[in-house]
């Protein structure tokens, strides 16, 4: 600010020392424009120098001539003069200037939409490349696709799902120029299956959460049933699992009370004497090893939860992840 004030004061003193003193309005104007920016201050100083150069004749010149003199002195003779817009040299360098701008009629496809100039098109959320993109223009009809489309075969839903998954993987690996009408139909069936899977609710839905292993088997062509259609274990296996914990429960019954033991002391004594008379080898052969007992104990511990899991397979659904279902 100090340098600006000093420059303004210096220019004002230089102007005041000229032939004609500035009036109050010109002084305010000079102060205002000089305080805008350093470039504006430099321009005002140059104008005052031009005015001092002409002296008292400057006041007698018309305003248009004053502006012309200022422009000529500020720009300088070495600056190139503006060219005529119809100059032949400019037209050769910029051929777009030859035709009239803003009068080109643009038509939008087959629809009845026209507008002038490519810059005055109606607003659209899609770009021009997105609007002009089409798969049918890039597709090449293959003979195998034509035969497959002409001979439709009834397929099960599982095989349709496997074909849809195969077609989706094939479309990722193959290029766009191999697409055909059958590929579009397969992709449509794939999205239809996905929609049915996401819409299915309850244990009676056709497509329920498939695990990754089931998806892989569908890709291989194997038929995979959802959890609601899985066969339950045979009744014999279930009866065997039921009998095993029942026998264990019978073994774990409480001992008879003291009154019955007092009434029948003879069989207990006979059984204990028979045990003492038996050979240790026979006892080792009859009694199971501690490892076998431990295994039997573990089987008894885990047998009932397994039965509960089998019985509730229709109610509790799979999570959809192998590491959660099979750990």
Curated annotation (Swiss-Prot):
Keyword Acetylation: yes
One Pfam assignment: DUF4706
Modified residues (Phosphoserine): 37, 129, 175, 289
Residue ranges, compositional bias (Polar residues): 134-148
GO cellular component, one term: cytosol
Record's compositionally biased regions (Basic and acidic residues): 182-202, 233-252
Keywords linked to the UniProt accession: Acetylation, Cytoplasm, Phosphoprotein
Compartments where found: Cytoplasm
Modified residues (N-acetylalanine): 2
Superkingdom field: Eukaryota
Main location per the UniProt record: cytoplasm
Segments of this protein annotated with the region Disordered: 1-22, 76-113, 134-299
Compositional bias per record (Low complexity), positions renumbered to this chain: 1-17, 162-176
Keyword Endoplasmic reticulum (UniProt): no
Name of protein: Uncharacterized protein C1orf198
Classification lineage: Eukaryota, Metazoa, Chordata, Craniata, Vertebrata
């Amino acid at each position: 600010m100090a340098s600006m004030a000093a420059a303004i004061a210096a220019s004002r003193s230089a102007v005041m020392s000229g032939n004609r003193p500035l009036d109050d309005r010109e002084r305010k104007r000079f102060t205002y424009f000089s305080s805008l920016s350093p470039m504006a201050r430099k321009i005002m100083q140059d104008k005052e120098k031009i005015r001092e150069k002409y002296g008292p004749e400057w006041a007698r010149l018309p305003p248009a001539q004053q502006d012309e003199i200022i422009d000529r002195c500020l720009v300088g003779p070495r600056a190139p003069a503006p060219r005529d817009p119809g100059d032949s040299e400019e037209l050769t360098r910029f051929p777009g200037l030859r035709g009239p701008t803003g009068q080109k009629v643009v038509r939008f496809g087959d629809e009845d939409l026209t507008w002038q100039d490519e810059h005055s098109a109606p607003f659209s959320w899609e770009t021009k490349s997105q609007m002009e993109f089409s798969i049918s223009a890039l597709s090449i009809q293959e003979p195998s696709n034509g035969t497959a489309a002409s001979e439709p075969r009834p397929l099960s839903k599982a095989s349709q799902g496997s074909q849809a998954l195969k077609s989706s993987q094939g479309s990722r690996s193959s290029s766009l120029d191999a697409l055909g009408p059958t590929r579009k139909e397969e992709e449509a069936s794939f999205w239809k299956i996905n929609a049915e899977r996401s819409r299915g609710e309850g244990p009676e839905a056709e497509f329920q959460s498939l695990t990754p292993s089931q998806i892989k088997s569908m890709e291989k062509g194997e038929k995979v049933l959802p959890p609601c259609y899985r066969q339950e274990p045979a009744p014999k296996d279930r009866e065997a699992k039921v009998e095993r914990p029942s026998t264990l429960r019978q073994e774990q019954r409480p001992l008879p009370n003291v009154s019955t033991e007092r009434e029948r002391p003879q069989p207990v004594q006979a059984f204990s004497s028979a045990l003492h008379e038996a050979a240790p080898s026979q006892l080792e052969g009859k009694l199971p090893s501690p490892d076998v007992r431990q295994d039997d104990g573990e089987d008894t511990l885990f047998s009932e939860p397994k039965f509960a899991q089998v019985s509730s397979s229709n109610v509790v659904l799979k999570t959809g992840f192998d590491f959660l279902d099979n750990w």
